């Protein structure tokens, strides 16, 4: 219904026309709808978010502040609901009893629980809905007058030297995005973009994990694990105060629910801590071991890596406190001009011939 309305609103008079004709229209309501969700380019708005949808698989919400990948599964909504449900149950059935318990002061523990749940929600939204580090498209096009023909040398790797004589950094030309990808970058076929320091595409968050949101991803795993532990502890104490289990069935339900749900984020958090401690991304690690099943392989340090600081502690500190970097493809800029070739989707080249 919203899509049909937004397709038809192009035929409506704009706000400028309404002011010139002295008539009142619903242009402000239309602008508000296009601010909430961007389905197509809206000529009546001072900001143009629709140009981004032509070169990526993203859909933008709330004036370009929130994004998600289109035509994918709704796992992210399911994940969000799964870690909200136990908090709702705890708030309704458990919190009041523990808060007013006369024997033991549980108020600090409850405050800490809600703090980590708030951190879980915020880090989930930042990791799932923010820019992972998208690289602009169509930056390295050799000849615009030759129908964007790609020369043969662009199909090779560019090897760059490092301070370590035994290590080198390779750069590859992306035929889809038409750029020389920066080191550690990779192209995501789901998002249809190249991402800086690409770690992996997380289907549970429906977003890529890269340089600009990797720390939020780790914070989400850490905060969700701690929240589950606190829920198990508080519900266990609530259950111990009850003479029989049948009087507090919700406590037992929360314990079982969180006891089963804690393992996946906990194992994933430990896995990424060891990866980050060796300055390796998931993409680099899977490529080095030649397998898509990393759980069966031991994580070892690459001594010749130019990114390793020879200390797990300093590697983690650098990862956690490094600058996120600039948003290179900002959907909230004043205007994306149609003539800007960075926002045009060129045909993919499959050979050395003219495309």
Curated annotation (Swiss-Prot):
InterPro entries: Palmitoyltrfase_DHHC (IPR001594), PFA4/ZDH16/20/ERF2-like (IPR039859). One of its GO terms (cellular component) is endoplasmic reticulum membrane. It is found in: Endoplasmic reticulum membrane. Residues 1-23 are annotated as: Disordered. Residues 172-222 form the DHHC domain. Pfam families: DHHC. GO terms for biological process: protein targeting to membrane. Residues 94-108, 237-249 are lumenal. Its EC number is 2.3.1.225. Autopalmitoylated. It is a multi-pass membrane protein. It comes from the Eukaryota. Keywords: Acyltransferase, Endoplasmic reticulum, Lipoprotein, Membrane, Palmitate, Transferase, Transmembrane, Transmembrane helix. It catalyses: L-cysteinyl-[protein] + hexadecanoyl-CoA = S-hexadecanoyl-L-cysteinyl-[protein] + CoA. Residues 1-15 have a biased composition (Basic and acidic residues). The chain crosses the membrane at residues 73-93, 109-129, 216-236, 250-270. Residues 1-72, 130-215, 271-355 are cytoplasmic. GO terms for molecular function: protein-cysteine S-palmitoyltransferase activity. Interacts with ERF4. Belongs to the DHHC palmitoyltransferase family. ERF2/ZDHHC9 subfamily. The ERF2-ERF4 complex is a palmitoyltransferase specific for Ras proteins. The DHHC domain is required for palmitoyltransferase activity. This is Palmitoyltransferase ERF2. It comes from Kluyveromyces lactis (strain ATCC 8585 / CBS 2359 / DSM 70799 / NBRC 1267 / NRRL Y-1140 / WM37) (Yeast). The gene is ERF2.
């Amino acid at each position: 219904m919203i899509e049909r309305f937004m397709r038809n609103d192009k035929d409506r008079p704009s706000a400028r026309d309404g002011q010139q004709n002295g008539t009142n229209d619903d242009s402000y309501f239309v602008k508000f709808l296009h601010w909430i969700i961007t389905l197509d380019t809206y000529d009546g708005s001072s900001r143009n978010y629709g140009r981004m949808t032509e070169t990526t698989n993203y859909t933008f919400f709330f004036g370009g502040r929130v994004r998600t990948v289109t035509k994918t599964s709704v796992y992210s909504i399911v994940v969000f609901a799964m870690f909200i449900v136990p908090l709702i149950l705890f708030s309704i059935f458990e919190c009041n009893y523990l808060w007013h318990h006369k024997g033991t002061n549980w108020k600090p523990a409850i405050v800490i629980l809600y703090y980590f749940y708030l951190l879980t929600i915020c880090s989930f939204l930042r990791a799932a809905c923010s820019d992972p580090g998208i690289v602009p498209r169509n930056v390295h096009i050799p000849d615009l007058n030759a129908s964007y023909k790609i020369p043969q040398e662009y199909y090779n790797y560019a090897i760059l030297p490092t301070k370590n004589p035994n290590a080198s950094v390779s750069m590859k030309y992306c035929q889809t995005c038409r750029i020389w990808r920066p080191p550690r970058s990779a192209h995501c076929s789901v998002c249809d973009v190249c991402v800086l320091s690409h770690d992996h595409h997380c289907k549970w968050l429906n977003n890529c994990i890269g340089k600009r949101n990797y720390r939020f991803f780790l914070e989400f795993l850490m905060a969700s694990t701690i929240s589950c532990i606190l829920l198990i502890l508080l519900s266990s104490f609530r259950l111990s105060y009850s003479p029989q289990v049948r009087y507090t069935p919700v406590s037992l339900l929360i314990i079982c629910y969180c006891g089963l749900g804690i393992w996946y984020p906990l194992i994933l958090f430990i896995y990424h801590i060891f990866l980050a401690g060796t300055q390796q991304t998931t993409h680099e690690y899977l490529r080095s071991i030649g397998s898509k099943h990393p759980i069966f392989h031991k994580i070892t340090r690459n001594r010749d890596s130019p990114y390793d600081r020879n200390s797990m502690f300093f590697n983690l500190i650098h990862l956690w406190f490094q600058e996120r970097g600039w948003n290179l493809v900002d959907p909230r800029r004043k205007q994306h001009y149609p003539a800007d070739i960075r926002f045009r989707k060129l045909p993919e080249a499959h050979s050395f011939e003219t495309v």
